[in-house]
Structures are given as C-alpha cells and as structure tokens.
C-alpha cells in the first residue's frame, strides 16, 4: 500500500527561485536550474528535497544526506557533501520555513475535516444564531442561541458554541471543542478538544467548600493560537484575557482572571493559577507552574519545569524549583555538585583499605 500524503504538494522551484525567496546565496551558480519539489529532514531527504542544517548535533546527518540542496550558515558551509547544492543563509531555519510556508500553505491552518464548504446537514444551528457568508460548519457541530460567527471561519465536527459566544472572522474551532461565555477575535486557531469558558476553580475553603460564582468571560484577541486539549477558565469577577498574537501549546491550563499579554509563548502542560498577569512577549517552557496573583514582566523567560512563587521582573531569565534568576540557580546547582561525595556527617565511609569506619 502506498504511503498516504495528507498535504498537497506545491509547485516545484529552481534553486535560483528559492535563493531569491529566502534571501540566501546559491554558492554554485551552475546549479541554479536544479528543481526542488519539497522539503525534508536531512536523514530523509532525496535529490528533489531542500533541507537545512543549523544544529551541530545533526552533523552526522549532514555528512550523509542525499538532499538536493541544503540551507546552511557560512560557519558550516564546508561540511556540506560535494553532491549537495549549498544555499548560504544567515538563518538557515528561518529561510527553510519561508520556503516550506510557500509550498505547504494548506498546512498553515486547519480546514474542514470533511472538505466541506457551507453548513453540514447534521449540524445543529439555533435560529437566532448569526453566521456571516462563507462560514463552514462540519457535521454534528452545535451552534447555540445568539451565537455570532464571522466570515471565513470553520467550526469543526462535534464542536459546541454555547449561547452568546462570538467568533470573529477567519477563525478555526477544532473538532470536539466546547466554548462558552467567550468573545473571540479574528484569525484565531483553536485546535481540537479545547475547553474554553468553563467555571474557574473558586471556592471558600470552609467545611462545605462553598462555590464562588464565576461571572466573568474569556476574551481571546486577534491572531491567537491555542493547542489541542488546552483549558481556559472564565473569570470570576474580571475577564480572563489572552492577548493578541500569543501562541499556546497543547494541554495548558489557564485559571480564572488570568491576563496574558501580547505575543506570549506558552509551551505544553504549563499551569497558570488564577489572577496572575503575564506581560507582553513572555516565554514559558514546558510544564512551568505559576502561583496565583503574581506578575511576570514583559519579555521574561522561564525555563521548563520551573515552579514560580514570586513575581518575575521584566526581561528576567528565571528557572528552578522554586524559580529564581537563572544565574543564581546555576551557581547553586554547581555548589551542590561540588559537595563531598563521601565523608559527610552521618554518611557511611570506608578507609583506604576499604574497611567500614565507625
């Protein structure tokens, strides 16, 4: 059985055309007319593929690659095998992505899972819902009362939009996603299985753990992307806000009243407790946990698997458990590693002949 290809192959390009597109320099001009039909990793590329090299860990793959051409920085140019055309680039990966985006435009955003345009017969749409022209609704999706959906948006199979939800233009709501009490801007990509706008985790910690009403909303601004399985709680009093251009990975939990600034990057399995604020351009590595009511300043970065219990200043580089400035954290790690491996108080030790002491 032939291996299926899930993405359409774009038109082929000559190396001269790729060089112009990526602002790279073709080192051997005699190869300008060689045609490239796709992109691939160095170890899987063939003569019609473009690859890139930027990480010294893959030097072995570069030495053995069968790629037709490789984007590479001047530093590693001499390591490219002679049968491979060299495209010299200041940032090889950035150049590679520019070409990949051109030939795989269908991979840039999800489309209807059923290759539909318009409304599937099995979709349930309340008569008071308002859908602009060009909206696609896949089978078994449910659109509730007073919902508004902008032109060009795609609602995936089995998605549920609860009463009053607003979806902007050119959005994609993935299959099985549930959205309630939320206002969503334009060009927002929500991958399958997300839960947006449910109750925040609010209780009075008495014997009966009385529930606190959660009467806020979720506001998602333009150009946000939300990964599969992510959950975003609505606010209790003020709104939960996801700022313009922020990109959230899979399986992230965002608590009630959280404010995330513009153009933030949040990797998988982060947990953001209620009422904390992230500034603009904040980056969180995978599995970062942040306590409630904290402020993470503009441009701050927190390394993966860190636990944050204090405010992080703007442009801070923090990490660890509990998180602190990375330079301090690294010094403490080195200090621990330099501690004696034996002879510490209370530890078993042996004399030079290997006999136990004490």
From Swiss-Prot:
Major enzyme class: transferase
Pathway involvement of the protein, from the record: Bacterial outer membrane biogenesis; LPS lipid A biosynthesis
Catalytic residues (positions): 256 (proton acceptor)
Stored NCBIfam families: lipid_A_lpxD (TIGR01853), PRK00892.1 (NF002060)
Subunit structure, as described in the record: Homotrimer.
Protein task: Catalyzes the N-acylation of UDP-3-O-acylglucosamine using 3-hydroxyacyl-ACP as the acyl donor. Is involved in the biosynthesis of lipid A, a phosphorylated glycolipid that anchors the lipopolysaccharide to the outer membrane of the cell.
Protein name listed in UniProt: UDP-3-O-acylglucosamine N-acyltransferase 1
Organism: Rhodopseudomonas palustris (strain BisB18)
Name of the encoding gene: lpxD1
């Amino acid at each position: 059985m032939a291996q299926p290809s899930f993405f359409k192959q774009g038109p082929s390009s000559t190396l001269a055309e790729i060089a112009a597109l990526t602002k790279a320099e073709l080192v051997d001009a005699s190869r300008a007319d060689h045609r490239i039909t796709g992109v691939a990793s160095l170890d899987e590329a063939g003569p019609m593929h473009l690859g890139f090299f930027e990480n010294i860990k893959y030097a072995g793959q570069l030495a053995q690659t069968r790629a037709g051409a490789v984007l590479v920085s001047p530093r590693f140019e001499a390591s490219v095998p002679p049968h491979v055309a060299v495209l010299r680039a200041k940032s090889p990966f950035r150049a590679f992505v520019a070409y990949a985006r051109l030939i795989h435009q269908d991979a840039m955003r999800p489309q209807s899972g059923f290759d539909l345009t318009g409304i599937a017969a099995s979709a349930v749409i309340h008569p008071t819902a308002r859908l602009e022209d060009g909206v696609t609704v896949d089978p078994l999706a449910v659109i509730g009362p007073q919902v508004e959906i902008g032109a060009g948006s795609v609602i995936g199979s089995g998605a549920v939009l609860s009463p009053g939800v607003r979806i902007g233009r050119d959005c994609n709501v993935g299959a099985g996603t549930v959205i309630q009490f939320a206002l969503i801007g334009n060009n927002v990509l929500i991958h399958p299985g997300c839960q947006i706008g449910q109750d925040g985790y609010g209780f009075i910690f008495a014997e009966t753990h009385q529930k606190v009403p959660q009467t806020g909303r979720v506001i998602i601004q333009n150009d946000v992307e939300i990964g599969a399985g992510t959950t975003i709680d609505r606010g209790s009093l003020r709104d939960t806000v996801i700022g313009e251009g922020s990109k959230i990975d899979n399986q992230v939990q965002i608590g009630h009243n959280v404010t995330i600034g513009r153009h933030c990057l949040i990797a998988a399995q982060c947990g953001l407790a209620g009422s904390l604020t992230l500034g603009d351009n904040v980056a969180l590595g995978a599995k970062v946990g942040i306590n409630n009511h904290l402020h993470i300043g503009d441009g701050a970065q927190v390394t993966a698997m860190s636990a944050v219990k204090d405010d992080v200043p703007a442009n801070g580089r923090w990490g660890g458990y509990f998180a602190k400035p990375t330079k301090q954290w690294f010094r403490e790690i080195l200090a621990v590693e330099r501690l004696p491996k034996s002879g510490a108080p209370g530890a078993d030790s042996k004399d030079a002949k290997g006999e136990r002491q004490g």
